[in-house]
Regions:
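Extracytoplasmic/periplasm-facing segments of secreted or lipoprotein envelope proteins
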Residues: 1-39
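Extracytosolic low-complexity repeat regions of secreted or lipid-anchored proteins
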Residues: 33-83
Length: 83
């Protein structure tokens, strides 16, 4: 199966905006553990929603930025920076 990391980055950005977070490419200096993403990962959507929901409830966090790093041929880590 083919894994489309761009789909998950777009999903995360859209979900962030839908729950009131702003996208800011400068919000890259603080992040929690990256989210595993790839063909074998079952919980990518749950994990993305969980992190973003938690950030949206934190009154000190208003901005996020979402990016990824490739860790293997079809495996990635998704980072959600916040500020």
């Amino acid at each position: 199966p083919v894994f489309d990391i761009d789909y998950w980055i777009s999903f995360a950005k859209s979900y962030a905006e839908s729950i009131g977070l702003m996208l800011d490419s400068g919000a890259v200096y603080c992040w929690d553990n990256p989210i595993a993403a790839g063909v074998k990962c079952k919980y990518t959507e749950r994990d993305i929603r969980g992190y973003l929901d938690r950030y949206a409830k934190d009154g000190d966090i208003t901005d996020v930025w979402i990016w990824y790093e490739q860790t293997g041929s079809s495996s990635y880590e998704i980072y959600i920076g916040y500020a």
